[in-house]
């Protein structure tokens, strides 16, 4: 028993203290309320609980310590058991995959031996084979083998379903398709699974298998609801449902997929889906198109859609010992690539792109749901994961609707101004208008937007990885965005404009990025962008005090397999309610070169993007990308009143064209060897970024005797860009030297962008008598002596704000031939007044 003196004596002799069941029960209750009580709290517990009064406070402390240790051990044991179950399941999966690969090798060896023995039959095989595997797609000619229509009566559909099931299983676990590992996939316990793409089969196909922490029934339920996880799925309508004798289900389905770009039509499918349970308890969901049937239901062609084909595909879901499921996925499509321009055909001929956008998307979504169930924590801004997931789906769907502009959703095309680079659409349907709220003006009048205008365009990019370009657009919004347009868009959901802003390239105050949530593998994340308003708006515009954008970003990981990259954003009200209106705009960049999709560039874009010059160093890893291409799609939406349609259309067209020009300029700066590829040489006065960083650092050390940059490997470029003091270069002209370069701190101090930097002269920032006198007296000293130091003072940003600095240093930057190249200034410990 636990008496006070006996407890102390036993504790001193290292013996255990025995507690009565009542005491243990009381301590457990206290532990649940407070696992780690302080000394005062423990004494209070003894007073409040008489049953513990005969136990020493020190011994109660030991009990709580031991209880926390046991809890930690229990959790660790539980975690290790879960890991062990996962590893056991993965080992089983790998053994099955190894067996399948051995069968595939045996099959290939047999085929190779056969063709070696019968070389004369190869020509006949090539000319007489009329199976689906011999479909030829070349140029604008699409040759489809002629087959007799299949019977679509209930008995005929059951026959098709059984045939589809057999073909799907042979693809998922057999050798019906030659699978090769998808480039760039990293195996391991934390990987998404085993992902493979087809080699040498009809159409495009992808296969994946992995572990999911959900039971098979729940997995099947989620996978059948494609619009919830497949962002490209516009709709999935179940037209008819039939039951089979073995307890299975036949479904006739009409499905529509969005087009990823404005340059190609969308796809639709008329298909059969068969769900059944196999003898070993596995769930199977398989599907295929019903494009050539008779004696049953059919789906006529839809305008603005190209009827594509799903070849036998589906999901094999097996229960896993200890919980969860082992999942096999096969996606096999013929997306009719003949129907799109030649330059875009690889979008519809890339199995890798299919794997990224469809097959892996299913696995990622299931893993995300599993984690949310096991860890239902509240994330940023008080949102639960399901609510944030719904917001991301609304952003994606709204952007896809804008890109596609279907007439059945109320979109109609406006007349062009003679230049077809930007397409304008307007939507005044009641459904669309429910997304906006009333617009109160400064004079007290309240208006309701009666339409939404969309300005969209697509353009081809060359030699710039999508992840690099999109990350730049996200981190340097000031390079392309106009605050007045953002403010106008924000007004549509809170306080409306009475007159239109004038787009001004480079008109941008600043931004603060507030992280919101991210997926398990960080391939997609959401954030809130807080924009600093410039305050240069008309008096009759009731602008929000703060401008917030909800933003979703994906595909910016440079080390991942190059895939589709998206930056989609929409203005939101500060209240950020779940039913807030969302009118998304944004960018989508898709690589067009399947051969280069597996490359993983590792680029530094900071300083390099500041210079309008050509190639990187010879050792740049991106040089191996060659003539890589991608297509960028841009879509911006604005709510407005119908009587302002002409003015809003003109403003939107002008703004999108300015965004396109800015993106092209940035893409050129980020492109490796862009000038060499076009047959041009950079002018001698424009060194590359790495060279300029080396010249600046070397000249500083020569004239001032100390190092400007602390040793940071060999990457002077990155060190200079992230230097805490404002570093900026200007031309050698004695009269009105023009800025040619600034690091990040320098751009922040000048309140400008890389695009507008060259419009700022040195004398503009010293826009006061003392500053100009100092500049006129010190500038010649730099040219003669090589450097100069200035005491603290005040200068001006490009926006007219006063900036104070503790000290300034100027020095002459010499090139490799010891000739002056530019003048560099560094402002130490600067701040806005």
From Swiss-Prot:
Keywords: Coiled coil, Differentiation, DNA-binding, Homeobox, Nucleus, Transcription, Transcription regulation. Probable transcription factor involved in the regulation of vascular development. May promote differentiation of precambial and cambial cells. GO terms for biological process: cell differentiation; meristem initiation; positive regulation of cell differentiation; positive regulation of cell population proliferation; primary shoot apical meristem specification; procambium histogenesis; response to auxin; xylem development. GO terms for molecular function: DNA-binding transcription factor activity; lipid binding; transcription cis-regulatory region binding. InterPro entries: HD, HD-Zip_III, Homeodomain-like_sf, MEKHLA, START-like_dom_sf, START_lipid-bd_dom. Signal peptide: none annotated. This is Homeobox-leucine zipper protein ATHB-8. It is found in: Nucleus. Its main location: nucleus. SUPFAM superfamilies: Bet v1-like, Homeodomain-like. Interacts with ESR1 and ESR2. Interacts with ZPR3. Residues 12-75 bind DNA. Residues 70-108 form a coiled coil. PANTHER family: HOMEOBOX-LEUCINE ZIPPER PROTEIN ATHB-14 (PTHR45950), HOMEOBOX-LEUCINE ZIPPER PROTEIN ATHB-8 (PTHR45950:SF6). Belongs to the HD-ZIP homeobox family. Class III subfamily. One of its GO terms (cellular component) is nucleus. Residues 150-378 form the START domain. Induction: By auxin. Repressed by miR165.
């Amino acid at each position: 028993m636990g008496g006070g003196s006996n407890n102390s004596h036993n504790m001193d002799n290292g013996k255990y203290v025995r507690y009565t069941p009542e005491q243990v029960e009381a301590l457990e209750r206290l532990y649940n309320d407070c696992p780690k009580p302080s000394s005062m709290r423990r004494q209070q517990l003894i007073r409040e609980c008489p049953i513990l009064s005969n136990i020493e406070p020190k011994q109660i402390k030991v009990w709580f310590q031991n209880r926390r240790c046991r809890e930690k051990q229990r959790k660790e044991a539980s975690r290790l058991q879960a890991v062990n179950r996962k590893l056991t399941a993965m080992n089983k999966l790998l053994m099955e995959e190894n067996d399948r690969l051995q069968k595939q090798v045996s099959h290939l060896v047999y085929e190779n031996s056969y063709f070696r023995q019968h070389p004369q039959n190869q020509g006949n095989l090539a000319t007489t084979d009329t199976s689906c595997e011999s479909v030829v797609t070349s140029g604008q000619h699409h040759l489809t083998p002629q087959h007799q229509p299949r019977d679509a009566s209930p008995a005929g559909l059951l026959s098709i379903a059984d045939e589809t099931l057999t073909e799907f299983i042979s693809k998922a676990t057999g050798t019906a398709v030659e699978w090769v590992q998808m480039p760039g996939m990293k195996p391991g316990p934390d990987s998404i699974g085993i992902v493979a793409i087809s080699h040498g089969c009809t159409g495009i196909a992808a296969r994946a298998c992995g572990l999911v922490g959900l039971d098979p029934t729940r997995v099947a339920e989620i996978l059948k609801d494609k619009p919830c996880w497949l962002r490209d799925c516009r709709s999935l309508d179940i037209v008819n449902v039939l039951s089979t004798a073995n307890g299975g289900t036949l479904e006739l389905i009409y499905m529509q997929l969005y087009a990823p770009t404005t340059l190609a039509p969308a796809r639709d499918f008329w298909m059969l889906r068969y769900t059944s349970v196999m003898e070993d308890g596995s769930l199977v969901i398989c599907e295929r198109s019903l494009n050539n049937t008779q004696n049953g239901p059919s789906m006529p062609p839809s305008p603005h859609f190209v009827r594509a084909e799903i070849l036998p595909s589906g999901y094999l879901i097996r229960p896993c010992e200890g919980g969860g499921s082992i999942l096999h996925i096969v996606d096999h499509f013929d997306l009719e690539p003949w129907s799109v321009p030649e330059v875009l055909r690889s979008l519809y001929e890339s199995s890798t792109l299919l794997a990224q956008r469809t097959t892996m998307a299913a696995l990622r979504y299931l893993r995300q749901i599993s984690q949310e169930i096991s860890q239902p924590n509240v994330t940023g801004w008080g949102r639960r994961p399901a609510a944030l997931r719904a917001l991301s789906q609304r952003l994606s769907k709204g952007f896809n609707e804008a890109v596609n502009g279907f007439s059945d959703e109320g979109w109609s095309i406006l007349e062009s101004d003679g230049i077809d680079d930007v397409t304008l659409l307007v939507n005044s349907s009641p459904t669309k208008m429910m997304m906006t709220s009333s617009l109160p003006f400064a004079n007290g009048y309240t208006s309701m937007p009666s339409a939404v205008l969309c300005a969209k365009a697509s353009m081809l990019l060359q030699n710039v990885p999508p992840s690099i370009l999109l990350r730049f657009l996200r981190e340097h919004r000031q390079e392309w965005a106009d605050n007045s347009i953002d403010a106008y868009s924000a007004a549509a959901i809170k306080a409306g404009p009475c007159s239109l802003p004038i787009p001004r390239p480079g008109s941008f105050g600043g931004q603060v990025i507030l992280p919101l949530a991210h997926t398990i593998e960080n391939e997609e994340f959401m954030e809130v962008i807080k924009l600093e308003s410039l305050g240069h708006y008309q008096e009759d515009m009731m602008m929000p005090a703060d401008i917030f954008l909800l933003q979703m970003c994906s595909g910016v990981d440079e080390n991942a397999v190059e895939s589709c990259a998206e930056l989609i954003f929409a203005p939101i009200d500060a209240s950020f309610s779940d039913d807030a209106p969302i009118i998304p705009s944004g960018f989508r960049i898709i690589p067009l070169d399947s051969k280069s999709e597996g490359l993983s560039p590792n680029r530094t874009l900071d300083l390099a993007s500041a210079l309008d010059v050509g190639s990187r160093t010879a050792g740049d890893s991106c040089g191996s990308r060659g003539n890589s291409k991608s297509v960028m799609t841009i879509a911006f939406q604005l709510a407005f009143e119908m009587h302002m349609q002409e003015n809003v259309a003109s403003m939107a067209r002008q703004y999108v064209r300015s965004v396109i020009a800015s993106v092209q300029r940035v893409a050129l700066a980020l492109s490796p060897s862009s000038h060499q590829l076009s047959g041009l040489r950079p002018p001698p006065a424009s060194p590359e970024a790495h060279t300029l960083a080396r010249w600046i650092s070397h000249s500083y050390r020569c004239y001032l005797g100390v190092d400007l940059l602390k040793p940071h490997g060999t990457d002077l470029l990155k060190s200079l860009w992230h230097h805490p003091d404002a570093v900026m270069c200007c031309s050698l002209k004695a009269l009105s030297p023009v800025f040619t370069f600034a690091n990040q701190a320098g751009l922040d101090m000048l309140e400008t962008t890389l695009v507008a930097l060259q419009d700022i002269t040195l004398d503009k920032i010293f826009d006061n008598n003392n500053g100009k006198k100092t500049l006129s007296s010190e500038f010649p000293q730099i040219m003669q002596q090589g450097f100069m130091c200035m005491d603290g003072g005040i200068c001006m940003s490009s926006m007219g704000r006063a900036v104070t600095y503790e000290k300034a240093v100027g020095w002459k930057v010499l090139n490799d031939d010891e000739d002056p190249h530019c003048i560099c200034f560094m402002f130490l410990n600067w701040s806005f007044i």
